[in-house]
């Protein structure tokens, strides 16, 4: 399998990490003030003198997904020649295990002549404070006693549960990448892959990535998969049209993985977002993603409330209510208190409802013709035909086959089909 481009083009040095200059200055100033680091690096990057930065015991990089938090730490370790001890909070479920792993990492000598060690707790907000017995306290204890740099990353460290961690660390916010920067990185990748990519096409990918460079690079790789060497705006449109289920998979994935309410809600601004389709897909994918009955029930409750808004909108045409419905259906389904940690890959199936509807499309068309014919000739509404007449005709047709024949002649639909419709 080809190397994912997010790995292939992961920045190796501090300078290669784009659009995060402020964070780089803060991080470098902290490292250079408190630990041993190469002079060249410090001269170039350690530009901050604030006491708060120089005195910090640990650094917590906060920001949305795919903006370079983890990459920045990897680049830092490489720049200063330190060995990186990387721990994912969810891998380390208990205080004992956490201390053991960090302790072992710090005790063992480095084989490759590193200048020191740096500990990275990736995604600390993935810690379930209740379940991960003592995990948070253990991290704080490690920070308090550590002689090596400790850095953490989090999408959302502003949950009150993480207050103690924020208090003891310097929180450095990384921003969403600008559209310009995303386009620039995509352009460079196109050149290096020998592909001709239209500026407009890259801009369109950048726009829908919402500042998440990882998502943008993944999209570009998908568009250029199979060795394709050109990318035009039309290609992007065509892929969207030909594979609506593909973009719906992406939409669902973004909704379920969104860390913040706003992030989930923003998906409705995406040009490919079709809320009617989304409702169908969400209905069938909630139990695929949320296995626990409680979480599942909260998600369904919110989706059903959104559906009540939709029902009202359809009845009264009060379209100004749509944003409320979408907030419930996107933010509400995505942000659930007991939300579990999601696996890296979720297999969202194609909704059965759509498959059944597609299979029965012809039969439904014939049924509509029949209903329309009866409604017009009997001077009644279509819903009356559906709820009453069809049933009565069905019973009559069983005892008198002429009824079916006459309907068949009048409608030009063969008699067997009429029988199955009644
Ligand atoms: N600022 C950046 N400069 C250059 N490349 C970046 C930047 N941000 C992200 N990338 C690209 O996106 C990929 C993912 O970035 P990274 O893992 O650092 O994101 P993250 O912010 O840690 O996200 P998450 O919170 O989901 O872990 C990188 O491998 C890199 O290719």
Swiss-Prot record:
Sequence similarity: Belongs to the activator 1 small subunits family. RfcL subfamily.
InterPro entries named in the record: AAA+_ATPase, ATPase_AAA_core, P-loop_NTPase, Rep_factor-C_lsu, RFC_lid
Source species: Pyrobaculum arsenaticum (strain DSM 13514 / JCM 11321 / PZ6)
Name of protein: Replication factor C large subunit
MF annotations from Gene Ontology: ATP binding; ATP hydrolysis activity; DNA clamp loader activity
Protein function: Part of the RFC clamp loader complex which loads the PCNA sliding clamp onto DNA.
SMART domains: AAA
Binding site for ATP: 63-70
The gene coding this protein: rfcL
Coiled-coil portions: none
Entry keywords, A to Z: ATP-binding, DNA replication, Nucleotide-binding
GO biological process: DNA replication
Subunit-level organization: Heteromultimer composed of small subunits (RfcS) and large subunits (RfcL).
Gene3D superfamilies attached to this UniProt entry: 1.10.8.60, P-loop containing nucleotide triphosphate hydrolases
